[in-house]
A protein has these predicted regions:
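Hydrophobic alpha-helical segments at protein termini of multi-pass membrane proteins
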Residues: 1-242
Length: 242
């Protein structure tokens, strides 16, 4: 009922970027499109991850504030790399694996990318609504080209390793699968930490670094999507690609 009392223009501005990216990724799934109900559930899991991350981030900030002085380099590193990035990417990954690892629909390597992006954009969608309602339309425009596609990029990096982990698991290579699953959490968490850390530094130089970081991250993510979509194959095949 709460949505009836919200500005529909702000709500649209908050959700359209995420929906646009979801449609693009869905269409990139070349071999076999995923069940719509599964994808919808992943978006909902992403929304759940938002709430869980809010709790752990609040608790983490309380602990950090009792140990470190705020707005120092060390404080920001601990906050954005450990508290924020580990919380958000950790819950995304845990819910992603819980919902999809044993799903019969998870039969292609690119599926890992699709699933991870849907969870990430579910997270971004709900987070974006909160920011836009609090700060207005200008925030929606900025986040439409930064935070929302940023979460999608984190999902690409998570999903690329996650899909590879599933293939190794199917091949019986459990050690390789575990390493890939660990990377599916660690790499997006590191990229997320870099994103937040650079974005919060109050310096013109860091502003340009942030723009460059986003540009490089977007380009790499798009290349990964294009390559994995083009060369996608069923998990049952023994060969790998990345």
């Amino acid at each position: 009922m709460i949505f009836f009392y919200m500005n529909p223009i702000l709500i649209a501005a908050a959700i359209i970027p995420a929906i646009f990216l979801l449609v693009k990724v869905y269409k990139a799934d070349r071999l076999e499109r995923e069940p719509p109900l599964l994808l919808l559930s992943l978006v909902l899991y992403g929304i759940i991850a938002t709430g869980l991350a809010m709790v752990t981030e609040h608790l983490g900030s309380v602990v950090l504030n009792s140990i470190f002085s705020q707005n120092t380099i060390l404080y920001n590193v601990m906050m954005y790399f450990i508290v924020v990035a580990f919380s958000e990417e950790g819950f995304k990954y845990l819910l992603l694996k819980n919902r999809t690892w044993y799903s019969p629909a998870f039969n292609c390597q690119f599926d890992g990318v699709v699933y991870a992006i849907f969870v990430s954009l579910g997270f971004a969608l709900w987070e974006n609504i909160g920011y836009v309602l609090r700060y207005g339309f200008g925030t929606a425009m900025v986040r439409a080209v930064t935070a929302v596609p940023g979460h999608a990029c984190f999902g690409v990096f998570m999903g690329a390793w996650y899909g590879l982990a599933k293939r190794y698991d199917n091949m019986g290579k459990q050690s390789a699968s575990k390493i890939c699953r660990f990377m599916a959490f660690l790499l997006p968490a590191f990229m997320h930490g870099c994103y937040d850390f650079i974005a919060t530094m109050e310096s013109v130089h860091y502003g340009w670094i942030f723009v460059g970081f986003i540009a490089v991250m977007f380009i790499i993510a798009l290349l990964v999507i294009r390559n994995m979509s083009k060369h996608d194959r069923y998990i049952s095949y023994s060969s790998t690609y990345f």
